[in-house]
């Protein structure tokens, strides 16, 4: 029996779906990736809560977090308009700057789509079988009619929370430090989500070269906790 999950116009339903899809317990495997943070800690570039907050805010404002938000927004629009998603999926995959970043986004995207099928939607038939994580999240949110601004804010917060969880395991800070950073990042996340909601593909671009290099260097790190 096929169960059709309708597009939601109810803000509470939209919120519940976002909280489920982007929860740390949603089986996308996010807990196993550090996005290069593990190498940054290893090399002494991130040593405390202040440095971690700075690292995260620039990833969100001008780094991979920003690019992923732009890709997420464009995927949402394609889903809402019934447009083809293969081109944006190919671009998102190509933008992965290293082997482990590519693995991180593709495996998370595939796992996200597999788990999100618990909320049936025709969008799954329009997506390629292998799909980068921001494209998967944006397309599924758009397919279910979840508002774009809320989807982007939740997506960016989930990105930061995953790295904050990694920072605890890496002994950069503790739970009190993490909660303080979460509170401090709220304006950054809100502002970046608002910019991304108005963005186009011409707004893609990042300037966090050290973070990208750390992701590359992690590939040869001998002792590690994370896959990226």
UniProtKB/Swiss-Prot annotation:
<protein>
    <recommendedName>
        <fullName>Urease accessory protein UreF</fullName>
    </recommendedName>
</protein>
<dbReference type="Pfam" id="PF01730">
    <property type="entry name" value="UreF"/>
</dbReference>
<comment type="similarity">
    <text>Belongs to the UreF family.</text>
</comment>
<dbReference type="InterPro" id="IPR002639">
    <property type="entry name" value="UreF"/>
</dbReference>
<keyword id="KW-0996">Nickel insertion</keyword>
<keyword id="KW-0143">Chaperone</keyword>
<comment type="subunit">
    <text>UreD, UreF and UreG form a complex that acts as a GTP-hydrolysis-dependent molecular chaperone, activating the urease apoprotein by helping to assemble the nickel containing metallocenter of UreC. The UreE protein probably delivers the nickel.</text>
</comment>
<keyword id="KW-0963">Cytoplasm</keyword>
<dbReference type="InterPro" id="IPR038277">
    <property type="entry name" value="UreF_sf"/>
</dbReference>
<dbReference type="GO" id="GO:0016151">
    <property type="term" value="F:nickel cation binding"/>
</dbReference>
<dbReference type="GO" id="GO:0005737">
    <property type="term" value="C:cytoplasm"/>
</dbReference>
<comment type="function">
    <text>Required for maturation of urease via the functional incorporation of the urease nickel metallocenter.</text>
</comment>
